[in-house]
């Protein structure tokens, strides 16, 4: 009986170690595109650092099930189990948040962007510091180009959220103001 227990314990330890190595490889694959420590340096590719676990899990699930289509992400998530998605999401949430761009930014554009964020109640779902929560993404210090692309996709309906909220909120905002909002969120302090 002791031998069987010892074998079972050793097998469990080996499987746990193998799973941890597999998770590390998957995270390394993520960071190859999304940047070291989850801070993207690649145009139109989002930074992942400190994204809420639940938000990331939902996005990975949507990529895996092709409910959200982006070929590289659909390929990376194909065949991953729910546990794999959970482990990746948890690891991503523990990465440091992305830092702001090196330049402080134009005070007038930042003030206009802050006013737009307040006027459109971005702080209600994304929190007052725009760090996101639960199934709502972190926006603070996200890549400006990615923010602009994504805001435009929500506005036109090319990208769907969990409901129509984002499309409704963004509908009255013109293209120039979308750019200013993205500028502000990338630099919000």
Positions of PLM-derived features:
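N-terminal secretory signal peptides that target proteins for export/translocation
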Residues: 1-3
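Bacterial N-terminal signal peptides
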Residues: 6-16
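Sequence/structural segment immediately N-terminal to covalent heme-attachment motifs in c-type
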Residues: 20-39, 100-101, 105-128, 143
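Protein kinase-like catalytic domain
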Residues: 34, 64, 126, 155, ...
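Gly/Gly-Pro-rich "capping" loops immediately C-terminal to redox-active cysteine motifs
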Residues: 38-68, 74-80, 114, 118, ...
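Inter-heme linker and motif-flanking segments adjacent to c-type heme-binding CXXCH motifs
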Residues: 39-40, 69, 94-108, 129-137, ...
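C-terminal capping alpha-helices of c-type cytochrome domains
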Residues: 78-100, 145, 171-189
